[in-house]
Design a protein with these regions (language model features):
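Nucleotidyltransferase catalytic core that binds NTPs
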Residues: 2-237, 246-250, 280
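Phosphate/ribose-recognition catalytic cores of enzymes acting on nucleotide-derived substrates
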Residues: 227-285
Length: 285
């Protein structure tokens, strides 16, 4: 496996792969890799001949007073995990490499999909995501790109971008990977102290209860939201940002009673750490 830091080096690697007619899988990450990322790299390795993992803490998707400086940076460990899971290249550029101009060019998806949920409290976040992912798509020219369902809103935004900008690639979405006790794997889990970590288990418990309500026939969105909200509020260390349901795809307003496929998403703070989690409510096949 090769660790590279420049656009020129990545272009060289991609040109060589293309010359051999290799299929390319891209796994964009912000580093601090965990088992969730590992599942993406494993899938990319299984489905493609050549795998690029990008490790870049993208400054443009962090707002003021967010955790850009505190975000964990563990490049050596990231490279080890990426190599173990079958990556051919780790691309770890500097901010200057990815944003060479004084003034930036932006790729922005508009509409409900970027305005609801995290878009309300993090207004510049998705513009930063779509811009950096566009750059990575242009550089790596992947046949397939891999993202996790944990970032469900990001996935919907990127699906829309891929469709609207005619990117010739397949967006592959992999299931949420959880700890044994149910907590969704996240690089930000490292911020939690022991009591916050225990408190955070209320997220997966409440979402599981919602899924059980839905399976038992409950279709009233307000009742499901109320039950999840009540469940989370029962944990005194929790501070709810949102508990909401939107229709899939593209996070449209829901029909009530619920029908089709819907995303139940939560964002909750434990201490200073904001965690997100979600579950899809739909008829079982």
């Amino acid at each position: 496996m090769r660790l590279i830091h420049t656009v020129a080096e990545l272009r060289e690697e991609i040109a060589l792969a293309k010359a051999q007619n290799l299929t390319i899988g891209l796994v964009p990450t912000m580093g601090a890799l965990h088992e969730g990322h590992a599942s993406l790299i494993t899938a990319a390795n299984r489905e493609n001949d050549f795998v690029v993992v990008s490790v870049f803490v993208n400054p443009t998707q962090f707002g003021p007073n967010e955790d850009l400086d505190a975000y964990p940076r563990t490049l050596e460990a990231d490279c080890k995990l990426a190599e173990e899971k079958g990556a051919n290249v780790v691309f770890a550029p500097s901010p200057k490499e990815m944003y060479p101009s004084e003034d930036d060019t932006w790729v922005e998806v508009t509409g409900d999909v970027t305005k609801v949920l995290c878009g309300r409290t993090r207004p510049i976040h998705f513009r930063g995501v779509t811009t950096v992912v566009t750059k990575l798509f242009n550089l790596a020219q992947p046949d397939r790109a891999y993202f996790g369902q944990k970032d469900a809103q990001q996935v919907e935004v990127l699906k829309r971008m891929v469709k609207d900008l005619f990117f010739p690639l397949e967006l592959r979405v992999m299931p949420i990977i959880r700890e044994k006790d149910g907590l969704a794997k996240s690089s930000r889990n490292t911020y939690l102290n022991e009591s916050e970590r225990t408190a955070a288990l209320v997220l997966s418990r409440s979402l599981k209860a919602a899924k059980e309500m839905y399976a038992a026939g409950e279709r009233d969105a307000e009742k499901i939201i109320a039950a999840v909200t009540e469940g989370i509020k029962a944990e005194p260390m929790s501070n709810i940002d949102y508990v909401e349901i939107y229709a899939l795809p593209e996070l449209k307003p829901i029909a009530n009673p619920l029908k089709g496929s819907n995303l139940l998403a939560v964002a909750v703070k434990f201490g200073t750490t904001r965690l997100i989690d979600n579950v899809v409510l739909e008829e079982e096949e």
